[in-house]
Amino acid sequence: FGTCISGCTDQSATNYNPLATQNDGSCVFPPCTAPAPTHETFSTGLMPIGVCSPNQWEISATTGDGWRFTGNPGYNASTFSGNNRSVGSFSWIDFSGTDVDPVLEVEDIDVSSLTSSALFFDYFSDLGTSSCAANNILHVEAFDGTTWNSVAVLQLNATGWNTYGYELTGFENGTTAQIRFRGESSGLSCDFYNDLLIDDVKIEEAVYGCTDAS
């Protein structure tokens, strides 16, 4: 009846054995990444579906319901107030309850095709006419293969939506960008006035030039 040769029979595996006649379960697959440039618009009202099915985007929280993808934020972040974007077209944290370490992790991005990778995103942190001594905090972090490192910390009050960009050189895990957004309360009892929103998350080529409008 011939000789059975055990080994990996899946051609997409890194240890594929073309001589194997029986799969022994030893297949090893390369890590799945989405190729840069990428652009997430949060337009479905659901957590994004990543390139690596079923879903490489992740959310987590120590306490609270964490990042949301639908529903209407409160106070000036409401779509009926200072926020001019439609419900279900951005991601946000509701600080009306207790939220600790709400994390939104972006799918892994292969940046090997970029000369200098950068992260861009739109951010909304606007108290409007409400009063609070300090705004809630957005931590932007990158994983280098060992630990999460701080790319930026945003604790600010700015009118409406604003775009922020950060070069990722030195923050990558080899040729992979692993990014997460972590929101934290200011710790003040008035933190519920300041829901935090993000939109249009992009990882693409860094753009250099003069940024002084004067």
How does the language model describe each region?
Residues F42, F121, G165-D191:
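Extracellular beta-strand ligand-recognition surfaces/modules
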Residues T147-E172:
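Extracellular carbohydrate recognition and processing domains
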Residues V111-T115, F124-A134, G187-L188:
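Extended, low-complexity, turn-rich repeat/linker tracts enriched in Gly/Pro/Ser/Thr and Asp/Glu
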Residues F90-P102, L154-T159:
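Extracellular beta-rich ligand/substrate-recognition surface
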Residues G97-V103, S131-C132, S186-E205:
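Extracellular carbohydrate recognition
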